[in-house]
Amino acid sequence: MTVHNPLVKRQQGSVVVPKSTVRPTTNGTTLKTRVASTNTLLYMPAGWKPSEVSPPDPAEAPPYSGYAYETPASIACIYSLVATATGCNPNTVTNNPTGGAKTIAIVDAYDDPWAGPDLAYFSAQFGLPFSTEKFQVVYQSGTEPPIDETGGWELEESLDIEYAHAMAPNATIYLVEANSNYFSDLLASVQIASNLIQCGRTTTCPTGSTGKGEVSMSWGGGEFSSETSYDSYFTTPGVVYFAAAGDSAGTIWPCVSPNVVCAGGTTLRRSPATGNFIAEWSWDEGGGGVSLYEGIPSYQSAIKSIVGTARGVPDVSSD
């Protein structure tokens, strides 16, 4: 259950918005000129300075006493992916998820040259299995895309692959890197991701291909009048498409597509004294609402009194 308690004081600190997350004030009118943004915000505790904090040595197995920050094990405990423990305390729980049997294809823009090493380091840090045979970077055009000079897309890519792996450590993960953050490149990469899941190759799959899995899209842009023309990108049989709802008010595409599971965000609140779980809150910065152009899908008929005749999002939310 998602809870917001206005009587509880917000944790003090500041939020840093990467340049890749800032939406343009005006956007293009075609897929080749319209850009997508990441959905990443960085929380900095009050008084925090980079020189004051160093991560634990990967050789030290979690949990890390006194940190009280979420780990794969603590999040798995909250969502009952493992045997639960009282408080699901990050300082004490150690059971990581063990699921994942199929394929997850993550689509992002630009190259993250440290994606593989970052994932290996992350896995060692939190006691997760890691195999190079189950992680592959795929380039949209077959050649390495440029990097994002702001570093924002690299951050998004590392976060995406790490927590996909954390929650489904036995799944095969593809990171599909688009040439740019133009929608034309991102949607071409979505098609590649769909093919990789359905038949294990980047080109069109043979008739009768039966592969199954998920495509993750942690990006989006403001809605536009012709967006419904492109919802067919998310209809490959056996593939479930997920997209982020965003980190600011309102709706974004492709999250509002009726062919996509729109994922919102929450925050897990913990006792400052013990680290035990208190409640799950919705974000006041989280995206959501009713679409400007997408009609209500049949599967939302039960909430028509809330969304009216339009597609409502998000569908699910989690930390």
Each model region followed by its residue ranges:
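Extracellular protease catalytic domains of secreted zymogens
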Residues: 167, 171-319
